From Swiss-Prot:
Belongs to the bacterial ribosomal protein bS16 family. One of its GO terms (molecular function) is structural constituent of ribosome. GO terms for biological process: translation. The lineage of its organism: Bacteria, Pseudomonadati, Pseudomonadota, Gammaproteobacteria, Moraxellales. InterPro entries: Ribosomal_bS16, Ribosomal_bS16_CS, Ribosomal_bS16_dom_sf. Gene3D superfamilies: 3.30.1320.10. One of its GO terms (cellular component) is small ribosomal subunit. Transmembrane segments: none annotated. It comes from the Bacteria. Keywords: Ribonucleoprotein, Ribosomal protein. This is Small ribosomal subunit protein bS16.
Amino acid sequence: MVVIRLARGGAKKRPFYQVVVADQRRARDGRYIENIGFFNPLAKDSEEAVRLNMEAYNAWVAKGAQPSDRVASLAKAYNKSAAQTEATA
């Protein structure tokens, strides 16, 4: 099964995650099909914490890919913030 999940990068005690589409049998940080964004849990106020290619995300979900719980919540929050910035602009 194809899943959308976080692959950890960064340094010790300084995590940085790539949002990737991968086969569930692959290792967490192993080979993936497509990189569709990133998540920085330690981002400061002025830094971008999440970037997600929503077109690719929605296309993979339509094809049957299962997002992890954390990725699903990040996508929901990213969609909400993108809608707010679009409404104010």
